[in-house]
């Protein structure tokens, strides 16, 4: 039985380790619950990501627009918005607000990893946008996690 671990502001974390949720099971769970956004930390705790305010959404949209424009101009990589989930080497499953990776790393992934499941890779560049309800320490730890798992640059 999964148990609630804690509530931090409006962020809920559930300990689902007893369920032994595989990467595929997590993918299927997310696909079956598309009205919600989830992440999973390296400890195997399920995190429910709440919707943001329209102001935060607008800032996130602008960041993704700028990153997309740079990506099209630079032509060395691929960019992703917050619906793109990555399985980090630590086992954490994260969906940064915006991210980018070199084309070579993108195309080194199998078609299945790019199209039919969450990609088992850490992006080269990640952006996490802090909203008023976000805990700064938790976001800093999340950014540290990206760097420890191979991100070369992170913006918070």
Task: Name every feature range the model reports, one short phrase each.
Residues 1-156:
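Gly/Pro/Ser/Thr-rich low-complexity, intrinsically disordered segments predominantly at protein N-termini
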